[in-house]
Amino acid sequence: IKPTTAVEKFNAKQFVKSYAKPYKNRSYRWHIVMYVSAFACMDMISALAVFYATDVWHGEKLFGMDISSMFIIAPLMVAAVVMFPLARKMMDKKSKQFAFRMGLPFYIFGGIMFAIMEPSWTPPILIPIVALIMGLGFGGAQMMPWIIFPDTVDVGEMATGDRSTGTYSGMMTLARKVGGALAVGLVGWILGWCGYKENNTGDTSVYIQQSDTALLAIRLVMGITVAVLIAIALYASFKYKVDNKKLARIRYFIDARKKGVDLSDEETAERDALVAELYGKVDEKDVVVPQVLDDEGNVVEVSDEKIDEEFGSAFGTVENDESENDKN
């Protein structure tokens, strides 16, 4: 009979600390801003497309069909798919954040055009054309955050010795869900404040005439949403500093630590500079002493002196209990 282990009590404080840990990583924070802004914008556009087509362009036809959200979403997605190979090429040639932001001006332009276009003077054919232009920025904005994510985990591992992929991924998903919920909710709240009339008849074929204020609100929210959120994402992409060259060095230092390779003074200084630039200040409580493996994959014991010599400069000096007591 195996002895039962003591049941650990749930520590809410420790739980919060462990899941807040990724946000100590400067590169991860900027990545989250890029990700949430781009995807929240997508959520709001998806929600507004129906109102925009059904209410703002009510009664207008294109190719013999009533204007619907299909004329917005379909061209948007087609252009996004076309941009994927180009984004991939620019990612390898330039950087991932460059591939993310290269089409964002088109995204912003498209949103502004949707805000200013109205049936009284705009040919309906401009709707899919503008959506197509917007999609040139939409593709990179949707694709690159997922490719950038592992690099932020690498930055964290270089700085602390801990590769908390699950925690980083969980907080990324949580931020996405919260941002998406607030974005879609905001659409409903704003339209409600502006006097949008709901269809309570139960018959979707019945059209409810909206006030000019509500129609203007739909157009303005469409434009302001894209302009503001994508501008934030664009700014964050410039603040995100991990490029291909730095990433290669980050992975070199991670691999060197795992293999117990001695770094030269120049390499140690380079690693410290990367940690300061890409991660920020390292909390000693977050530091995990990595296992050193030999060529056969066996764990090699490392002395405290070796740990302090190799990792102290980047992690903050690793001290044992005796040295701490001496200070006190």
Give residue spans per PLM region.
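Long, low-complexity, intrinsically disordered segments
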Residues: 297-328
